[in-house]
From Swiss-Prot:
This is Carboxylic acid reductase. Its cofactor is pantetheine 4'-phosphate. It comes from the Bacteria. Catalyzes the ATP- and NADPH-dependent reduction of carboxylic acids to the corresponding aldehydes. In vitro, also catalyzes the activation of medium/long-chain fatty acids as acyl-adenylates (acyl-AMP). Binds 1 phosphopantetheine covalently. Its EC number is 1.2.1.-, 6.2.1.-. The lineage of its organism: Bacteria, Bacillati, Actinomycetota, Actinomycetes, Mycobacteriales. Belongs to the ATP-dependent AMP-binding enzyme family. Carboxylic acid reductase subfamily. Residues 645-720 form the Carrier domain. Transmembrane segments: none annotated. One of its GO terms (biological process) is biosynthetic process. The keyword Signal does not apply. The modification O-(pantetheine 4'-phosphoryl)serine is found at S679.
Length: 1168
């Protein structure tokens, strides 16, 4: 027995002697042996556990109390610093009562599928066990998946019932658009909580007459009054569970689990979990849609332990929950260990003072983490689901002291395969390595055989639900499962993970990179002769080995070459549209080329990857370690010394540390995006700057084209010395998960004197002669600029455009470039209209005083007659907290201008997406946004932050109208399409442009983009989009028609005209369209999608990055045909008709000319 094993044994003995809860949770060997006996059915197995441990605590979750706000009268939930538990007896009885209720009509019968959407909890576990009692098939849905990803699963499984947590009720209701079961059950529901009750009431109203909605409590109460339902008959081969997985690409596919496999979650002998024999007290944070979540939960219950659940699914309470639970088992994924590691460094950096003994402080902090955060009584630790770096493993084991960190390897399909690289016996029946010649891996390799690992296991899944074709692909002719992982066999039954067979590498943050394609991109650099991209799945970025060109060596010399090559790689990456995580963070310069002779090229001159990894792998891994150490040291130094250091140098160092550059490479005049930063790394920089300087720096400011690092430093200086501006934290609370319209009052944004004077200001000018326009470089904004220039020409007026830039001259140049798209008439028209009528100012609506000097701001306050505001930071990933500054506070800043000097009518461009959290029947054009959407969720769903930020702007405008009499017109736009007048003007990043390019570039389309009817025919459908010229004219015309009112328009195409995506393909194929396209239709949608994706991935880089590929998940299944508009447009259409807007004096239909224009414009821009 090793010293560590001896220490662990003594640790366990001490815990048995000193910790009553630990001792009371000791597993009963008789029960363990009984449930391991053959012939025991799954429901009987669970009954043995529940009755055998009847009086023990089975499940625990945080205690709650209900708190009523004295101002609003609304009741909410507050977490208490303790857990409440239910016993095994109570859990079994509760599940039985629920099963009885679910047996009543509409009854759930054996074999029925039931989808469950929610995070793991006592209620979730109750439902899961009830379904087992009924013989139903549980289909856990991923709460992180978008509705578009859930619908195909619901459609495929056709559930009899959907159970959803209250937090996911909105998504569940949306999912029902594809398949509507008879019953929807809501769990984790508290009737006293206003938001819970209102959500259920809204769902019932929306689904009235089609779906029965019950809360779990109502069903259990109903079940108590009914005769108990007997446990359903079961069979080992009966389907019991579907776990949906899609890997890195492809449509979701459901891995089938028979009852015998589900039993393996409960049995010690199955190999799913480590059979320690110690008490199991666990904190459960993994979802039930992941096999890891089920392993931990049911492994705990079968061991007679207590399974506690984290209080919040976003893990924001993880450390608090850990400290309260004091688990005996730490079953974490690498990301959780990363969080513990970050907490350690943060605490060490916080306490470290000059002259302190760092090693002693680190030991002290580790001891405190071990006892106070992790609870101090763990006896087992496991990591799995993704690779973990050797450095992190070593650090974790130093933290855990006497406990070894077990690294598990397995899959949804095969179960657990390896522990610490060793084959799990008897769970693994057989395995083999097969050669992968295209990657250079062979069983004859020395010193160890290498190849793809194929396995047979006791827990092997039988296949994917209703997907025999995909099932066949993952098994070889001998019945071995293809793991897709390249392994080296380093000893008997011992393996080391090397790579993915498809050479697509998953980085630690979950992003995938295709190394061969990146090598092709970076090989285009004139300074690069050869390049080998190297990645490690435990790291967030790749590295490289670069062989410089002969010219680069002779011109720069080896000693000066690295920064020059680094800059060249960044330039190539920008040109190819690469993401920051695809760019090598650092590289080794190799002056000896890769050749056939030195074994670093294959016979067909491809990179010999195994040999390259063997030759350079150790050096590259050392480079990873050096970079991590350097970054950690630099960030620690910045947190300690940054507050007292000059801002600009500190900012440059912070940007360099986060992006993996050297401070010498980061110039003050560099833009963050030019250094390889994106919106997510900008978010990390914003958080770091807040830690260093104690000020909020919005992501919008960091990524603004007007903000180089020097400008960012100026922003920080101003924020430190000046008056703090409104922020998400000051308005809603830094950690808010819900925001309220009542938070957004004008007095929090605008000084009292301005507000007091506003109602008595001179009325708006009778004639508009001076217009202030934001967002003129945007797609809609440029057309608004042309429209207003044309109108100002008639009245000898002026258009003032506010453009983000460092100077007025640069702002003018940015706006000029917007119109220079290859159409000489457009350029000439713009210049003629602008002569004497156009003023361009460098400014930003998100900045104090719009980023203008005081004299200029006052001039605008005195002279502007109308404000037109289409400007916004449009980002569908960033949270509301980061979009608050540019989109909400920026609107307030413009309102301050609108309410100074004289009242200036305000035209605001919003988005139809604000309606996503509003019941459809309430989402009308004349409703007050504060009334129909008083509270908004903050979550990580698609575009949640952007929609909330535009909602906030609407709320502020309503406030300004009500309090100050400000005329406001809001235009909620949906898809805005290209015009037919000008050449080259496209909104390249939008989904529709990407679709048109992709159809033309691949030459294939599905038989229909929509679901077919019962006879397999195309259905009538409608696509909601309007040409940008019409939208601009409508905004400019209607925006000035209501001088004293607050008016909202839904700018949408409302027609049931049968003009949809299928008709667009017809038009492209028509000889009369002039598109020059020939697009082949493929009847089978799945076949089209597969060929389409393959073709897109094979496109040249520039085309591929402009293609539909990043948004292809929206097309995984045929769309449900919609005829007409998703929101009412009566007010908008009546106003358009009355004002006779557009050629038709009405909302236009989409035409073949618009679709053909996309193709001609894409050709002009060199994308086709």
């Amino acid at each position: 027995m090793s010293i560590n094993d001896q220490r662990l044994t003594r640790r366990v003995e001490d815990l048995y002697a000193s910790d009553a809860q630990f001792a009371a949770a000791s597993p009963n060997e008789a029960i363990t042996q009984a449930i391991d006996q053959p012939g025991v059915a799954l429901p009987q197995l669970i009954r043995m556990v529940m009755e055998g441990y009847a009086d023990r605590p089975a499940l625990g979750q945080r205690a709650l109390r209900f708190v009523t706000d004295p101002d609003s009268g609304r009741t909410m939930v507050e977490l208490l610093p303790r857990f409440e538990t239910i016993t095994y007896r109570e859990l079994w009885a509760r599940a039985g009562t629920l099963a009885t209720a679910l047996s009543a009509e509409p009854a759930i019968r054996p074999g029925d599928r039931v989808c469950v959407l929610g995070f793991n909890s006592v209620d979730y576990t109750t439902i899961d066990i009830a379904l087992i009692r009924l013989g139903a098939v549980s289909v856990p849905l991923q709460t992180s998946a978008p509705v578009t990803g859930l619908r195909p699963i619901v459609t495929e499984t056709e559930p009899t019932m959907i159970a959803t947590s209250i937090d996911n009720l909105g998504d569940a209701v949306e999912v029902l658009a594809g398949h509507a079961p008879a019953r929807l059950v809501v769990f984790d529901y508290h009737g006293k909580v206003d938001t819970h009750r209102e959500a259920v009431e809204a769902a019932r109203a929306r689904l009235a007459g089609s779906v029965t909605i019950d809360t779990l409590a109502e069903l259990i109460e109903r079940g108590r009054a009914l005769p108990a339902t007997p446990i359903a008959d079961s069979a080992d081969d009966a389907l019991a569970l579907l776990i949906y997985t899609s890997g890195s690409t492809g449509a979701p596919k459901g891995a089938m689990y028979r009852e015998s496999q589900v039993m393996s979650f409960w049995r010690k002998s199955s190999g799913w979990f480590e059979p320690s024999g110690y008490p199991s007290i666990t904190l459960n944070f993994m979802p039930m849609s992941h096999v890891g979540g089920r392993q931990v939960l049911y492994g705990t219950l079968s061991n007679g332990g207590t399974a506690y659940f984290v209080a919040k699914s976003d893990l924001s309470t993880l450390f608090e929950d850990l400290a309260l639970v004091r688990p005996t088992e730490l079953c974490f994924v690498p990301r959780i260990w990363d969080m513990v590691f970050a907490e350690f460094h943060s605490e060490v950096d916080r306490r470290l003072v000059d002259g302190a003994d760092r090693a002693a402080l680190e030991a002290q902090v580790k001891a405190e983490l071990r006892e106070n955060v992790l609870g101090g009584r763990f006896v087992m630790a496991l990591t799995g689901s993704a690779p973990i770096s050797a450095e992190m493993t070593a650090w974790v084991e130093s933290l855990l002291a006497d406990v070894h960190l077990v690294e598990g390897y397995g899959s949804t399909e095969a179960g657990m395969v390896l522990n610490d690289g060793m084959v799990r016996r008897p769970a693994v029946i057989d395995y083999k390595l097969v050669d992968v010649p295209e990657l250079g891996y062979f069983g004859t390799d020395q010193p160890y055989p290498r190849g793809e690992l194929l396995v047979k296991t006791q827990t092997m899944f039988p296949g994917y639900y209703q997907r025999p074709d995909v099932t066949a692909e993952v098994f070889d002719p001998d019945g071995f499962y293809r793991t897709g992982d390249i392994m080296a066999k380093v000893g008997p039954d011992q393996f080391v993970y090397l790579d993915r067979r498809n050479n697509v590498l998953k980085l630690s943050q979950g992003e995938f990179i295709a190394v061969s394609k990146l090598e092709a991109v970076f090989g285009d650099s004139p300074l690069v002769r050869q390049i080998f991209i190297y990645g490690n799945s435990a790291r967030a970025y790749p590295l490289a080995v670069v062989v410089p060109s002969g010219d680069a060596l002779s011109r720069h010399g080896i000693e000066n070459l690295k920064p020059v090559i680094s800059e060249s790689l960044q330039e190539v990456a920008r040109a190819a549209g690469l993401q920051s995580y695809e760019i090598p963070r650092d590289f080794i310069i190799e002056t000896t080329p890769f050749t056939l002779e030195n074994g670093l090229l294959t016979g067909i001159r491809k990179l010999a990857r195994p040999q390259l990894k063997k030759f350079y792998g150790e050096r590259l891994e050392r480079l990873y370690t050096e970079l991590a150490d350097s970054q950690s040291n630099e960030l620690r130094e910045l947190r300690q010394s940054g507050p007292d250091a000059p801002v600009l140098p500190t900012l440059c160092r912070a940007a360099a540390a986060l992006l993996g550059s050297t401070a010498a490479d980061v110039r003050p005049d560099a833009h963050f995006a030019d250094l390889g930063g994106d919106s997510l790394s900008a978010l990390s920089l914003a958080n770091l700057l807040h830690e260093i300087f104690g000020v909020d720096v919005p992501v919008g400011v960091i990524v603004s084209p007007a903000s180089d690092l020097r400008a960012l430093a100026d922003h920080i200086e101003a924020a430190r010395t000046g008056v703090r501006r409104p922020s998400f934290a000051s308005i809603h609370g830094r950690s808010a998960t819900e925001v309220h319209a009542s938070d957004l009052t004008l007095d929090k944004f605008i000084d009292a004197a301005t507000l007091a004077a506003a109602p008595n200001l001179p009325a708006p000018s009778a004639q508009v002669r001076t217009v202030l326009l934001t967002g003129a470089t945007g797609f809609l904004g440029r057309y608004l600029a042309l429209e207003w220039l044309d109108r100002m020409d008639l009245v000898n007026g002026k258009l003032i455009c506010l453009v983000r830039a460092r100077s007025d001259e640069e702002a003018q140049a940015r706006l000029d470039a917007t119109f220079d798209s290859g159409d000489p008439y457009l350029v000439r028209h713009y210049r003629e209209l602008g002569a004497g009528r156009l003023e361009v100012l460098a400014g930003d609506k998100g900045e104090a005083d719009l980023g203008l000097d005081r004299v200029t701001w006052q001039r605008l306050a005195d002279t502007v007659d109308l404000i037109v505001d289409p400007a916004a930071l449009v980002n569908h990933v960033l949270p509301y907290s980061q979009l608050f500054g540019p989109n909400a506070a920026g609107t307030a800043e413009l309102l301050r201008l609108a309410l100074t000097g004289k009242r200036k009518p305000y035209i605001y461009t919003s988005t139809i997406a604000v309606g996503e959290q509003i019941p459809p029947e309430a989402f009308t054009e004349d409703a007050d946004i504060r009334a129909i959407s008083p509270t908004r969720r903050i979550d990580d769903s698609y575009a949640n932050g952007y929609a909330n930020s535009k909602w906030a702007g609407e709320v502020l405008l309503r406030e300004a109208h009500e309090q100050c009499g400000l005329p406001v017109t809001v235009f909620r736009c949906d898809m805005i399409l290209a015009d037919t007048s000008y050449t080259g003007q496209l909104n390249l990043p939008d989904m529709f442009t990407r679709l048109m390019l992709s159809l033309a570039a691949t030459g294939i389309a599905p038989g229909s983009f929509y679901e077919l009817d019962a006879h397999g025919n195309r259905q009538r459908a409608h696509y909601d989009g309007l040409p940008v010229e019409f939208v601009a004219e409508a905004i400019c015309t209607l925006g000035t028609h209501s001088p004293d009112r607050f008016v909202t328009y839904h700018v949408m195409n409302p027609y049931d005209d049968g003009i949809g995506l299928d008709e667009f393909v017809d038009w492209l194929n028509s000889p009369t369209s002039g598109s020059g396209c020939t697009i082949q239709r493929i009847a089978d949608y799945g076949e089209w999608l597969q060929r389409f994706e393959t073709s897109l991935r094979a496109l040249p880089d520039r085309q591929r990055h402009a293609s539909l590929l990043p948004l292809l998940h929206n097309y995984r299944e045929p769309a449900k045909p919609i005829c007409g508009s998703i929101a009412p447009t009566d007010q908008f259409r009546a106003a358009v008709q009355e004002a006779k807007i557009g050629p038709d004096k009405d909302i236009p239909h989409l035409t073949a000319a618009i679709i053909a224009k996309y193709i001609s414009n894409l050709r002009l821009l060199g994308l086709l």
